[in-house]
Amino acid sequence: MALSMSLSSDILSGAPTAGRGGGCSAALSPRGRGSKGLGTRAPGPRGDGQQPPLGTGGDEDPGAGSASAGGSRLAAAAAAEAAAPGDRSLCWAPRGRLLASSPAGEAGSWGRARRGGPRPGAPCKGLAGPPLRPGLARS
């Protein structure tokens, strides 16, 4: 019993730091840590798809709470966007989220992809010459 209480308090103490980062990886990190601890104490029940052992039911609450907080934050940002439709034409992403995947960033990656590869109308780099006939293969 003391072991499960210390494990849940460890996860609870890690939940606020995971909540700050937001996103799926932060929401799953406490659960991943908890599953390692469960593997050493009770390896069977978790892999079979059965209910978790009695003292470990609370391990998933911090992860689920941070995920729901992220979802409510995203919903609040979407509601703010719906209230101000004039800003919508400038950027489709909600404010405070998804800043790394802005339209300018996507355009930059497109340019990088075009520079490295051949032009759309040009033949492949390895076959710079007239097209081969089916019966005459180079060796």
From Swiss-Prot:
Here the segments flagged for biased composition (Polar residues) are 1-11
Where does the record place Low complexity bias? Answer: 63-80
Protein name, per record:
Putative uncharacterized protein encoded by MAPKAPK5-AS1
Q: Where is this region: Disordered?
A: 1-80, 100-139
Superkingdom assignment: Eukaryota
**What gene name is listed for this protein?**
MAPKAPK5-AS1
